[in-house]
């Protein structure tokens, strides 16, 4: 966020505030760390920021290093920088500058910490986060240095508790979080052990007043060591030599009698840990109070979630293909690395320029907004948002065509002649699901699974062919061929009654509300329970558009802003609003059509815009044969850009009294009542898998979206900041889009896109079976390749990697980025500690596995592979990585 005072000036201002506090300080040693806050954008277009880092900024930092060389070693200038910008500097700096930078790294004047940059961790996924540590690891290894044991996040107020799990399992010992000075902070101690869902504990220093810390400790600081982080403002670079010396002298002045040395965050950890500090343990997730900003780019967010899976599924598929006897014709690891980097950059916390900077238009609404936009006054700021979206577009261009080609090559390689469809399962357990192939080729009435001999029915509608693919091996494939044989099928349970507006299958019976185009009743036929709360203020499967009032945006700003009101209100409130009242709108009087085929029954609701809601949109509700889920698809056509604060939701009010909620968040399933740290976001958050809504008997309903991670419980949560909110009603709201941020996220949402949602019943709740497994199967659909012609030489079916425990994920299987060989990474998500047997494909050449941490460092004794399998004990929610030897 924009500050009207430089980082160094802020540091010196804080100095005067703490001077009176430090006379009786017990501190014997102060480690001074210098850093600048890195935004990929915000102060300028991101390309310009990247250029400046590799040119003027690093040259200025080298100058400060050179001028300090005559000082004692512990007084020489040392500059801490994140992994990714240092990677950019090394790759883009001029040759002579690059050599100087490399030498400064080896000499310890440039210090690279473990994380790539400040991220909104909640927007990411498990494997992209792991890969994001690779930039710093590679730089350290190239310089012959140990891997960094320190890490830093700045600006973003709160983070997913995946951080202590991930960093600890990567060998990192210390994390510093510096909060934006205007934003509310989680209620945590200054220094504490942060315990992750796997019970890993990470020493964490949370400073709520600014990016860095104060130059001297507060009065109640109980330790002999203090960390003074002098962090200059957004992209402002390293201090000059004169500023550097002034800052160090200021620290000495404020800590009389203490030894003051310039160093790293790791130096602070290594010193204070010798004191055996008595620290409070905080076990809890801290939902991000900024995370709603990602849903200002709903299409890109949807694609990012797909790419977070498909990118690493591609590498696993390529690795397996080599074992099966067909090496890829393309450099798959290089494509994966570039896609992973783009995903990381999308998860980086900066989006674009801010309206408050005055560099592109100003806040206007209605006709005035349309006029300014037509004249091009917003072109500069809109391009900055486009830069952010291009990271996702770039990954799509890399990954999606390669996945398509690889699947076609697999289909061509199998020893089956003629038309054939190959179905690949990217998950490490056998599964069944429906697949879709688009082809104009002629097919007979059924398909045969070559491996099992099963005959399955097909539905062919012009160029769209669908069928149920059963018994697809874990991370393996099966081949299907056209046949004239009749499929043996039981009587269909699919039906609809247009007059009564009803449809059903074996598992569910749905009755629609014709007036509102929503679900009036949804019966879970297995439990005979009604899912829908008919008395709710919201309808089930209802699209809701909110237009907020100035009273609401102002209340949010007053609740959330903790300091700097004069500038922070412009970036966290919404200026120039008039007194137009709050409005909540939904479509009505939909056109309803039903259809049925051998695999599904569908109701389509089409809504035309009117004076109350100007959007044209549709809702599609589908039940499938032999599939215990309800599919809901929302689709909007030509949404206009709207600068007025707004949000769109799909509501699901469930018929449960006194509900319990289970949220499948990043790294673990959590209880929002017990596991959220106060002061973080209790009103709105992201999920990674799914949601459970349970009654007192641990029975109820599950739901997820592969496209929409943002949701609120009980009531819609945009423009709300609550310190003690506890959801009471069994309502789940998925956030389709919003433009709440007035800072640097996209400020108006427009266009056409879709979002899917899935609902199922829960009989006996367990994290794995109720949430993780169904959600992962939805996020990782079966992959299909089609070809025709001569047969290849590869088997018609092959097994891949399997795990004995469903819900243990294989997040990576491919080339070791930290050394020789291949790596396989498991991640326990069932929330239970148990042994897990991992079975590798036939014909693999691996003899043993070497346990390692998330950065490839060996951690234990080799484990022999016997009969293509090895067994390990994995703790609940823990990652486990192995080098295959």
Give the label of every model feature segment:
Residues 1-23:
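Bacterial Sec-dependent N-terminal signal peptides
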Residues 9-10, 163-168, 182, 188-190, ...:
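C-terminal (or distal) subdomains of carbohydrate-active enzymes
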Residues 21-127, 131, 140-143, 280-283, ...:
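N-terminal catalytic cores of secreted or lumenal carbohydrate-active enzymes
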Residues 26-31, 37-40, 318-448, 460, ...:
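Histidine-centered catalytic/metal-binding microenvironments
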Residues 78-85, 179-182, 188-192, 221-302, ...:
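C-terminal domain-boundary segment and adjacent tail
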Residues 96-114, 164-184, 193-205:
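Acidic, His- and aromatic-enriched active-site or binding-groove loops in soluble protein domains
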Residues 120-142, 202, 206-219:
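Alpha-helical scaffold elements lining the catalytic groove of polysaccharide deacetylases
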Residues 130-169, 217-231, 870:
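CE4/NodB-like, metal-dependent polysaccharide N-deacetylase domain
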């Amino acid at each position: 966020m924009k500050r009207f005072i430089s980082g160094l000036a802020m540091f010196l201002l804080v100095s005067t505030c703490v001077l009176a506090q430090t006379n009786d300080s017990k501190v014997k040693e102060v480690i001074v760390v210098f850093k600048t806050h890195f935004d990929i954008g915000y102060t300028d277009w991101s390309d310009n920021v990247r250029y400046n880092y590799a040119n003027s900024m690093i040259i200025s930092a080298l100058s400060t290093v050179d001028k300090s060389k005559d000082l004692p070693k512990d007084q020489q200038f040392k500059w801490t920088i994140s992994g990714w910008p240092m990677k950019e500097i090394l790759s883009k700096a001029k040759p002579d500058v690059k050599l100087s930078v490399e030498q400064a790294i080896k000499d310890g004047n440039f210090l690279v910490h473990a994380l790539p940059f400040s991220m909104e961790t909640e927007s990411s996924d498990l494997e992209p986060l792991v890969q994001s540590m690779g930039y710093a690891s590679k730089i350290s290894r190239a310089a012959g240095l140990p891997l960094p044991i320190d890490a830093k996040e700045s600006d973003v107020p709160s983070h997913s508790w995946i951080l202590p799990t991930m960093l600890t399992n990567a060998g990192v010992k210390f994390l510093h979080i510096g909060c934006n000075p205007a934003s509310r902070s989680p209620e945590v101690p200054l220094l504490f052990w942060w315990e992750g869902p796997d019970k890993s504990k990470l020493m964490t220093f949370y400073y709520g007043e600014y990016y860095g810390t104060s130059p001297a400790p507060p009065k109640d600081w109980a330790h002999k060591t203090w960390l003074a982080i002098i962090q200059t403002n957004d992209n402002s670079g390293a201090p000059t030599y004169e500023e550097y010396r002034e800052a160090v002298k200021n620290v000495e002045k404020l800590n009389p009698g203490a030894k003051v040395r310039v160093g790293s965050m790791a130096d602070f950890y290594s010193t204070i840990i010798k004191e055996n500090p008595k620290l409070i343990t905080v076990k809890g997730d801290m939902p991000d109070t900024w995370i709603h900003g990602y849903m200002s780019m709903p299409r890109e967010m949807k694609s990012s979630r797909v790419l977070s899976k498909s990118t690493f599924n591609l590498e696993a598929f390529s690795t397996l293909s080599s074992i099966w006897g067909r090496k890829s014709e393309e450099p798959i690891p290089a494509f994966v690395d570039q896609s992973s980097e783009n995903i990381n950059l999308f998860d980086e916390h900066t989006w674009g320029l801010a309206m408050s900077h005055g560099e592109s238009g100003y806040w206007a609404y209605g006709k005035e907004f349309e006029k300014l936009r037509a004249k091009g006054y917003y072109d500069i700021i809109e391009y900055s948002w486009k830069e952010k979206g291009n990271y996702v577009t770039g990954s799509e261009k890399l990954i999606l065509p390669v996945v398509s080609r690889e699947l076609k090559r697999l289909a061509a390689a199998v020893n089956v002649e003629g038309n054939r469809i190959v179905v690949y399962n990217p998950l490490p357990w056998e599964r069944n699901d429906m697949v879709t192939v688009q082809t104009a080729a002629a097919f007979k009435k059924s398909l045969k699974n070559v491996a099992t001999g099963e005959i399955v029915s097909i539905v062919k509608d012009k160029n769209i062919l669908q069928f149920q693919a059963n018994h697809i091996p874990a991370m393996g494939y099966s081949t299907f061929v056209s046949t004239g044989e009749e499929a043996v099928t039981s009587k269909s349970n699919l039906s609809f009654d247009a007059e009564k507006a009803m449809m059903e299958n074996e598992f569910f019976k749905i009755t629609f509300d014709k007036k509102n185009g929503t679900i009036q009743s949804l019966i879970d036929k297995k439990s005979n329970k009604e899912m829908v709360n008919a008395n709710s203020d919201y309808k089930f499967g209802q699209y809701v558009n909110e237009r907020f009032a100035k009273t609401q945006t102002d209340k949010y700003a007053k609740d959330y802003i903790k300091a700097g009101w004069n500038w922070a209100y412009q970036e966290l409130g919404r200026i120039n609003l008039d007194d137009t009242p709050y409005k909540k709108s939904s479509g009505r009087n939909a056109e309803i059509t039903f259809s049925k085929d051998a695999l599904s029954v569908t109701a389509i609701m089409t809504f035309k815009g009117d004076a109350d809601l100007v959007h044209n949109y549709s809702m599609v509700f589908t039940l499938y044969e032999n599939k215990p889920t309800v599919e809901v698809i929302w689709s909007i056509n030509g949404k206009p850009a709207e600068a007025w604060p707004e949000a769109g939701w799909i509501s699901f009010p469930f018929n449960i009294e006194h509900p319990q909620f289970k949220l499948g968040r990043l790294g673990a399933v959590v209880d929002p009542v017990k596991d959220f740290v106060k002061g973080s976001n209790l009103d709105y958050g992201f999920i990674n898998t799914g949601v459970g809504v349970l009654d007192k008997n641990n029975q109820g309903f599950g739901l997820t979206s592969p496209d929409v991670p943002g949701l609120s419980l009980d009531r819609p949560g945009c423009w709300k900041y609550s310190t003690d909110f506890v959801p009471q009603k069994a309502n789940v709201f998925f956030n389709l889009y919003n433009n709440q941020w007035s800072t640097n996220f996209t400020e108006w949402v427009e266009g056409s896109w879709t979002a899917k949602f899935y609902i199922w019943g829960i009989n006996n709740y367990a994290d794995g079976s109720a949430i993780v497994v169904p959600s992962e199967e939805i996020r990782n659909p079966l992959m299909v390749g089609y070809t025709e012609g001569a047969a290849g030489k590869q088997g018609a079916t092959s097994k891949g990697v399997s795990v004995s425990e469903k819900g243990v994920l294989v997040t990576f299987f491919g080339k070791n980025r930290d050394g020789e060989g291949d790596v396989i990474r498991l991640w326990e998500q069932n929330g239970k500690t148990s042994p897990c047997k991992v079975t590798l494909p036939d014909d693999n050449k691996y003899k043993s596995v070497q346990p390692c941490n998330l950065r490839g460092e060996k951690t234990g004794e080799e484990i022999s592979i016997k009969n293509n399998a090895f067994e390990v004990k994995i703790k609940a929610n823990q990652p486990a990585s192995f080098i295959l030897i």
